[in-house]
Amino acid sequence: MNESSSMSQNESKSINSTNCQRLSIGQTSKKISTNINSIIINSQDKISDVPSETSNNQKQSFTEIQGIGFIGIKDKSGNKNGFGIQKMKDGSVYKGNFLEDKYNGIGIFYYSDGDIYQGEFNNGITKGYGEYYHEKEVTYYGLWLDDIQFGIGSEIWSDNSQYFGNYNNGKKDGIGTYIWADKTMYEGEWKDNVKEGFGIYHFKNGNIYKGEFKNNIINGYGEFIWDRGKKYYGFFKNEKKDGFGIYYWSGEKFLIGFFKEDKQDGISKYICKNKIKYYRWNDGKKSKHFLNEEHFFNFFRPSEKKYEVFFK
């Protein structure tokens, strides 16, 4: 029965290494200032100040960008309205549309450290569809709300690992699929950047787990299918068989019983080619062989009674 032990150490590590500790754009990206005037030196010498009215009652005002400043369209009141280029004190640059002195519409924001955001802005912050390019690390394509990922989006890392799914408050949250560079894959529910709820995990060796996850690891009821055809249906705790379960070697050979930390522990019913045997196990070792079914059921513990129907 040692052959039935669940995941290998490598498989267990693979489940845990969702790379969620890697860059999460919503957690590490820089907030875009909503107060443009606070980061502009307004004493730049104007090249020209054209007073002629445009068709939308605006005038063009060009301010030379010598390290810091703005070049673009201002209205009569001096507010930035329309297309412009804004350079900040830290070297960041915004190119795009303005409305009442704030980024509004489509634009590109170049961070001083090399990161780039291009997409929609609303009232000075990222909102709507946008793409974030983190230098040499990860790219995010998707929806934003108040400067963080919110809604459907995808991330692609430099090693070609990728995630597609839902985000909430800058974290993977909801339904999503994560594919590692070695083609290991998780499809299922997420909460606060970790696997939480129901999911399907495809190991690179062909094994598959379908079931519950808790805090990024296998916990609860699930089904583990080995690539060689063996199967386990039952409960897990900390990625090990723990509780009631059924282990199949083949259609004619299977065991119904209890497990603890991946070992048989408690009563079990063993069926092989229509022959039935009853056992009690202790830490993976047989401690008692029951003579018949009646003898077997007389030894049920209170905690085992609810599973009695599965042994009949």
Mark where each language-model region is.
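Intrinsically disordered, low-complexity repeat tracts enriched in Gly/Pro/Ser/Thr and acidic residues
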Residues: M1-K312
